């Protein structure tokens, strides 16, 4: 089994209306993330020979999501989520990439700080722990 990932980053603001701490207030993060794609075999023909997927293909799916919904947005509005936690953002990105037909989509990880992250896994796959 092979797993590749593509990293991304975005600056955004959000607030968690149900949170009892400081995250209830409007605040921002320098978010980072990774999209993981898995395959039990490598491509054997064409320009992707020897690859799970060309990273540029994954980037082509990911970049519009970042540009049009995440980077420098107020996530409560742009994602249509009442409480855009890192968990919810990871699931939202996963759903959009799945809708776009990204083959082998395994998981999406979103880091809101360098020490705090959430990772959403495909229900079809077992998490790698």
UniProtKB/Swiss-Prot annotation:
Recorded metabolic or biological pathway in which this protein acts: Purine metabolism; 7-cyano-7-deazaguanine biosynthesis
EC number: 4.1.2.50
Keyword Glycosyltransferase: no
GO MF, any single term: metal ion binding
Required cofactor names: Zn(2+)
Swiss-Prot/TrEMBL catalytic activity: 7,8-dihydroneopterin 3'-triphosphate + H2O = 6-carboxy-5,6,7,8-tetrahydropterin + triphosphate + acetaldehyde + 2 H(+)
Signal peptide: none
Co-factor: note: Binds 1 zinc ion per subunit.
Binding site for Zn(2+): 14, 27, 29
Family: Belongs to the PTPS family. QueD subfamily.
Protein name: 6-carboxy-5,6,7,8-tetrahydropterin synthase
Native organism: Synechocystis sp. (strain ATCC 27184 / PCC 6803 / Kazusa)
């Amino acid at each position: 089994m092979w797993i590749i990932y593509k990293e991304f980053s975005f600056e955004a603001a959000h607030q968690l209306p149900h949170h009892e701490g400081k995250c209830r207030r409007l605040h921002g993060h320098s978010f980072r993330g990774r999209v993981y794609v898995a395959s039990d075999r490598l491509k054997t023909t064409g320009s992707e020979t020897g690859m799970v997927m060309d990273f540029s293909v994954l980037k082509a799916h990911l970049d519009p999501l970042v540009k049009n919904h995440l980077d420098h947005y107020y996530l409560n509005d742009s994602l249509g989520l009442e409480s855009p936690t890192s968990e919810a953002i990871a699931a939202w990105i996963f759903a959009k990439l799945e809708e776009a037909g990204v083959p082998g989509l395994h998981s999406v990880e979103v880091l809101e700080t360098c020490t705090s992250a959430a990772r959403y896994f495909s229900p079809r796959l077992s998490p790698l722990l």
